[in-house]
């Protein structure tokens, strides 16, 4: 919405409030980003059509996209689900909310941690996950971030300022203990709550998760959009633990992992088909994957399938043979051999340890 300003949006919001009961809606609050020409409204409504009719009757401005959201998720990402207490009141009583919904999102992924052989025993050390995540959450809060979600090996956080997100990430990286057998990956990206995805901050989170599937030699990766938000002294001298990624590479990674996500289960899917979908030659794809992801295309596809299989083993009770076929392996025995070579455990043993949370 080019040329949008907070006062006009406040007036439109008031018109919505006056007519909300006629459409069985409740207009809770909104966010305005004048610089980016973006408005995000939070409305309790029985249907998308009710929201469209309300806006159409109240002021004629039809929403570009409507998605369903959970209040708790909005609160986690944006920090509120009602009007801010410090909203400006004009002389005639108009409440003006001048608060952007643009956020910097942090995603942390811990790849396999403490699966190691000792005296012919396997130790599954869940305490290592907990220690890293506890420290990470503390640094997020200390730098004015908000924890959106946190699991044993994964976390999402939201920040208003790019500098705070970067400093929190650096504090997490600086606190990592080199003696821990952990591959901690942190990625930062900035975005708006509603774009192409039907999930809140869906496109931003999707890219972050794809970036954290990349094998890399630095724990922290930042996108070009995030780099632009940092003060010059910070991005002009990025430490060796940080890597920035160019916009064109972001697009390639999104396209590549989108294809892998959609086709990894197909046993007939191969690199030749992947090249056709990306409109690249095999040599071009090889150069890109080895440069960005440190894998040849064939190894990338195999490792992606193994990674997804590991996810399924950790989160489901499906038989190993079923998981092997669902991730594109034509033979359960070949899958078992590849899994053991990659992770040092038989798939069934890994599944049992993951579910039991053993700490021997």
Task: Mark where each language-model region is.
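Basic/polar phosphate-binding segments, predominantly the helix-turn-helix DNA-binding elements
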Residues: 271-300, 324-349
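Alpha-helical scaffold within the catalytic cores of cyclic-nucleotide enzymes
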Residues: 127-144, 156-192, 203-216
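A short beta-strand->alpha-helix segment at the C-terminal rim
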Residues: 184-192, 215-240
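Short amphipathic alpha-helical segments
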Residues: 2-26, 123-141
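Catalytic NTP-binding/metal-coordinating core of nucleotidyl cyclase/transferase enzymes
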Residues: 95-164
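Basic, amphipathic alpha-helical hairpins
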Residues: 256-269, 289, 293, 310-319, ...
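Short S/T/G/P-rich N-terminal loop/turn motif that feeds into the first structured element of a domain
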Residues: 1-21, 76-105, 112-115
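Terminal helix-turn-helix DNA-binding modules in bacterial transcription factors
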Residues: 291-330, 353-360
């Amino acid at each position: 919405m080019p040329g949008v300003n907070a006062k006009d949006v406040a007036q439109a919001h008031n018109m919505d409030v006056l007519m909300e009961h006629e459409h069985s809606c409740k207009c809770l609050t909104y966010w305005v980003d004048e610089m980016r020409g973006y408005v995000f409204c939070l409305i309790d409504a029985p249907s998308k059509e009710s929201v469209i009719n309300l806006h159409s009757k109240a002021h004629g401005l039809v929403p570009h996209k409507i998605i369903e959201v959970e209040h708790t998720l909005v609160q986690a990402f944006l920090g509120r689900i009602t009007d801010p207490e410090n909203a400006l009141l004009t002389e005639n009583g108009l409440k003006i909310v001048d608060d952007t919904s643009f956020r910097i999102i942090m995603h942390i992924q811990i790849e396999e941690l403490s699966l190691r052989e000792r005296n012919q025993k396997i130790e599954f050390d869940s305490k290592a996950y907990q220690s890293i995540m506890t420290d990470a959450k503390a640094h997020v809060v200390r730098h004015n971030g908000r924890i959106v979600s946190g699991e044993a090996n994964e976390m999402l956080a939201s920040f208003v300022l790019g500098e705070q997100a970067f400093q929190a990430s650096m504090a997490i990286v600086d606190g990592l203990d080199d003696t821990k057998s952990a591959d901690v990956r942190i990625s930062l990206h900035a975005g708006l709550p509603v774009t192409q995805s039907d999930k809140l901050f869906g496109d931003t989170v999707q890219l972050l998760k794809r970036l954290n599937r990349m094998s890399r030699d630095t724990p922290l990766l930042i996108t070009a959009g995030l780099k632009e938000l940092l003060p010059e002294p910070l991005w002009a001298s990025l430490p060796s633990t940080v890597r920035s990624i160019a916009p064109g590479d972001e697009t390639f990674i999104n396209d590549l992992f989108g294809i892998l996500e959609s086709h990894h289960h197909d046993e007939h899917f191969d690199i030749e088909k992947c090249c056709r979908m990306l409109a690249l030659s095999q040599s071009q794809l090889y150069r890109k994957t080895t440069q960005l992801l440190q894998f040849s295309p064939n190894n990338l596809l195999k490792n992606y399938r193994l990674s997804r299989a590991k996810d399924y083993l950790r989160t489901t009770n499906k038989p190993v043979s079923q998981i092997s076929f669902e991730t594109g392996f034509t033979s359960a025995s070949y899958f078992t051999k590849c899994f053991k070579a990659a992770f040092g455990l038989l798939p069934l043993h890994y599944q049992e340890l993951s579910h039991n949370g053993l700490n021997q």
